[in-house]
């Protein structure tokens, strides 16, 4: 009788252990939460466009002036800004107010910047159209600069299309790019920041968003499409 009781107990224990194992196997793991096709297919409801679609929208229109922001729009320039922060103000953003940093950034540190592929495609398209190309940046102006040559060389911009970089600077409470866009009669302006889009709208230009790379040192990342503007797909690189 004792052997029968022990056998029944062993069977019950084995069944309980097996049930626990099945339950554990079928329960979601916090380390492996999984996903589903609905989540994978989910897209933000914003106005996505491609470079080809932008080009098509300009078909039949005469050459015009177009503008680009620089940092995180045509260049991934975080390496220079990272070095500037580490060198001049590791614990704060004060390096951005340091003229020595801007002298270095505008005179050579863009050699460490990576040209963005989306910028290459856009600039090639506008060169084919015969558009005048401007770069309007919020960087502080310096007595000398090599940024214009770096951009012309990296993106193979002919002298007939290229214009010297405009250093609009940064003034609290003021969008310093707006007046420059108006003065140069820029009809399309590409940028990664909210200020780029609002500057274009201030002067009746077409503002088109380029995505800022998620590993940019410029945080927080902006909410692309928040103004209803066009946002270029795959433009983070």
From Swiss-Prot:
Record-linked Gene3D superfamilies: HAD superfamily/HAD-like
GO cellular component: outer membrane-bounded periplasmic space
Pfam families in UniProt: Acid_phosphat_B
Keyword annotations of the record: Hydrolase, Magnesium, Metal-binding, Periplasm, Signal
Superkingdom field: Bacteria
Signal peptide: 1-25
Stated regulation of activity: Activated by ethanol. Inhibited strongly by EDTA and more weakly by other divalent ions chelators 1,10-phenanthroline, EGTA and dipicolinic acid. Inhibited also by nucleosides, inorganic phosphate and Ca(2+). Unaffected by F(-).
UniProt-annotated location(s): Periplasm
Residues noted as binding Mg(2+) in the record, renumbered to the chain: 69, 71, 192
Active-site residues annotated for this sequence: 69, 71
Functional description taken from the UniProt entry: Dephosphorylates several organic phosphate monoesters including 3'- and 5'-nucleotides, 2'-deoxy-5'-nucleotides, pNPP, phenyl phosphate, glycerol 2-phosphate, ribose 5-phosphate, O-phospho-L-amino acids and phytic acid, showing the highest activity with aryl phosphoesters (pNPP, phenyl phosphate and O-phospho-L-tyrosine), and to a lesser extent with 3'- and 5'-nucleotides. No activity toward ATP, phosphodiesters, glycerol-1-phosphate, glucose 1-phosphate, glucose 6-phosphate, NADP, GTP or 3',5'-cAMP, ADP or ATP.
Full protein name: Class B acid phosphatase
Native organism: Escherichia coli (strain K12)
Source organism phylogeny: Bacteria, Pseudomonadati, Pseudomonadota, Gammaproteobacteria, Enterobacterales
